[in-house]
């Protein structure tokens, strides 16, 4: 379902069988209401525009058209909604089935700075207690870099050159 949103839009979900729509139906309106791209995707989009602008200067014949640039903006919003759908559906299912301590492991994108799934969990279960752990990469390991502060309650600090998988 998130893939359908990322390559198309939220309307793509309405074409899913009714049985599938039960999984995301409760959060669909919330996701549809998102009008601003997530800063993570906005940053990626801005980098693409910068590369495009430099490319435009060196190869004007291959420059992105205004239509292509608008499509890039729309794609950024679709990606934001797709990630929001994942977070909202995960949160809805956790909130509906939570009976005790629950450990949910996911990538930083989904929980850093109290965003992503945490936003939805707090909406669906306002009294929920959440503790987050975030992995950060930095050169100096003895002290948390100020840019990493506020991402989580606890940190796993690794050297910048640590191999990463996505």
In which residue ranges do the predicted regions lie?
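C-terminal regions of proteins
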Residues: 80, 85-103, 109-166
């Amino acid at each position: 379902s998130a893939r359908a949103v990322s390559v198309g839009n939220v309307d793509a979900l309405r074409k899913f069988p009714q049985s599938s729509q039960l999984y995301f139906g409760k959060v669909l309106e919330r996701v549809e209401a998102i009008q601003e791209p997530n800063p993570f995707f906005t940053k990626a989009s801005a980098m693409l525009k910068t590369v495009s602008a430099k490319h435009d200067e060196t190869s004007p014949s291959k420059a992105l058209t205004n239509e292509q640039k608008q499509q890039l903006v729309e794609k950024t919003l679709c990606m934001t909604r797709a990630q929001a759908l994942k977070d909202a559906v995960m949160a809805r299912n956790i909130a509906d089935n939570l009976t005790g301590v629950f450990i949910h492991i996911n990538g930083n994108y989904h929980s850093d700075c109290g965003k992503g799934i945490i936003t939805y969990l707090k909406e669906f279960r306002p009294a929920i207690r959440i503790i987050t752990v975030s992995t950060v990469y930095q050169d100096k390991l003895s002290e948390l870099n100020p840019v990493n502060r506020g991402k989580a309650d606890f940190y796993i600090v690794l050297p910048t050159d640590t191999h990463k998988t996505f």
